[in-house]
UniProtKB/Swiss-Prot annotation:
Catalysed reactions listed for this entry: N-acetyl-L-glutamate 5-semialdehyde + phosphate + NADP(+) = N-acetyl-L-glutamyl 5-phosphate + NADPH + H(+)
Organism from which the protein derives: Cereibacter sphaeroides (strain ATCC 17025 / ATH 2.4.3) (Rhodobacter sphaeroides)
Domain of life: Bacteria
General function of this protein: Catalyzes the NADPH-dependent reduction of N-acetyl-5-glutamyl phosphate to yield N-acetyl-L-glutamate 5-semialdehyde.
Predominant place of localization: cytoplasm
Protein's recorded name: N-acetyl-gamma-glutamyl-phosphate reductase
């Protein structure tokens, strides 16, 4: 049975990525696309690379007939999603790609996002969307909150190590490089080609990046006690991709074994042989995560390197993976695309 899909916020990067992936999905059909500022336009006018697809025109959200929609992807800006989702039909399944429902604690949300949540009852209802760790909850959920792309990358590298008890929880450092599409499509001076190309810089450093809220929440939940990591992201002049270098204290072989054992049966998680390290070029445009482990010259220390595509596995691909579970479909449906190379 084909499921009818609406994409709210289809004129942004994650919205366009949803369209690209769903176009070849065997059990999903796009029946509505919203883009309030571009209402009335064809998707091919906004994204010429989608010209070959037969898609509905963009419209305003309040013009969509949700009685004909089985599931909606909400790819709207942070803070906008909570207001829009609050007004949607209560029986509608929703996957939200914003940050609005990732943190379960209203106080934590206010700490990291600077203002109270406008829909705290939905915040508590939402299921955190790191698919491989919340499958059962996602299957029965009405509202799923997509993770932050940086937060997903770091968690894939670290969660199994906390679960297996093979690292020092008080000494975890994440050094992360992110592609520019993670900053969204709106015009920003620091994202202009002349400002960004041929250089890289740290941003939201010193423990201020909002994805730290997700790390705190998830790692502390697993450990049963507060866990805080050091995290510094860097913006790099590539369109897609995230590479996280995670420095931990623990036996390198035990670290590698914990990751390999945890992801042995996972479709989209690939742990490389010990000593091999991954590259963002090998997962570009795909829903795959590659993870590598090596030892350090300092005994008892290990380096874990994880890579994923921020627009796919870090956002839209993850969202479709979660939607597949919510709709009772094959979890990997529409997502087995090979990476784009070179």
């Amino acid at each position: 049975m084909v499921q009818n899909i609406a994409i709210l916020g289809a004129s942004g990067y994650t919205g366009a990525e949803l369209v690209r992936l769903i176009a070849t999905h065997p059990s999903m059909r796009i029946v509505a696309l919203s883009g309030d500022r571009k209402a009335g336009m064809a998707m091919s006018e906004v994204f010429p690379f989608l010209r070959h697809l037969d898609l509905p025109r963009l419209q305003k959200i309040d013009e969509i007939n949700f009685s004909n929609v089985d599931l909606a992807f909400c790819a709207l800006p942070h803070a906008t999603s909570q207001e829009v989702i609050s007004a949607l039909p209560r029986d509608l399944k929703i996957v939200d790609l914003s940050a609005d429902f990732r943190l379960r604690d209203p106080a934590a949300y206010e700490t990291w996002y600077g203002k109270p949540h406008s829909a705290p009852e939905l915040q508590k209802e939402a299921v955190y969307g790191l698919t491989e760790f919340y499958r059962d909850e996602i299957r029965g959920a009405r509202l799923v909150a997509g993770t932050g792309c940086n937060a997903a990358t770091g968690q894939y590298a670290i969660r199994p190590l906390i679960e297996a008890g093979v690292i020092d929880l008080d000494d975890i450092l994440i050094d992360l490089k992110a592609g520019v599409s993670g900053a969204g499509r709106s015009l920003k001076e620091n994202l202009l080609h002349a400002e960004l190309s041929e250089g890289t810089h740290a941003y939201s450093a010193g423990g201020t990046h909002r994805h730290l809220g997700e790390f705190d929440q998830e790692f502390s939940k697993i450990a049963g006690r507060p866990v805080q990591v050091r995290f510094t992201p860097h913006l790099t002049p590539m369109n897609r991709g995230i590479l996280a270098s995670v420095h931990v204290k623990g036996d390198p072989q035990a670290v590698h074994r914990a990751l390999a054992d945890r992801y042995l049966t996972e479709t989209f998680l690939e742990v490389l042989p010990f000593g091999a390290l991954p590259s963002t070029r090998d997962i570009r445009g795909s829903n795959y995560v590659h993870i590598g482990v090596i030892g350090d010259r300092i005994p008892g220390c290990a380096l874990v390197v994880a890579v994923l595509d921020n627009l796919c596995k870090g956002s839209s691909g993850q969202a479709i993976q979660n939607a597949n579970l919510m709709l009772g479909l094959d979890e990997a449906a529409g997502l087995r695309l090979a990476p784009v190379f070179p």
